[in-house]
Amino acid sequence: MIFSSLHYPGDYGFIPQALHADGDPLDVLVMTNEPTFAGCVIEARPLGVFRLVDKGQLDDKILAVPHTDPLFHEYHTLEDAPRHFLDEVAHFFSVYKDLESAEVVGKGWEGLEQAYAEIENAVARYQGDLKNLFV
C-alpha cells in the first residue's frame, strides 16, 4: 500500500519462491502496456535490478518484461528499455514513501547479470528457509 497519490510505473509484485535478504519475497516490477490484476502470475524475464535502501535495509527491485508479449520481444537488458522509463522508476522509488516519513535511498541500476545473481540468491535463500521448517 502506498500512502501517497503515486502509482507504480509498472505491475508490481514478487517472484514466487524467492526470498530477499530483508526477509521479504523478492520484489519485481514488470513493464506492461496494459494493467493486469492482483494475484495474476506473469511469465517475465529480468532486465536488471534497481538497488534501494529502505529504512536502512537493502530492498532491491527486479525490473522485468512479459516474456511472451511481442511489444517487449527486443527487450533483453536495461539498455533496451527507454532511459526515461528507467528514470521514472528510479524517481518513483526515491519518493514513494515520503508520506510515511521513511528514509529511502536509491542506489541505482545494475544489469542483467546482477539481476540473475540476486534472483538465484533469493531462490537459494527461500529453499534454505523451507528446509529449516522441517528440521
Question: Model-predicted segments: where are they?
Answer:
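Hydrophobic N-terminal alpha-helices or hydrophobic patches in metabolic proteins across all domains
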Residues: M1-V135
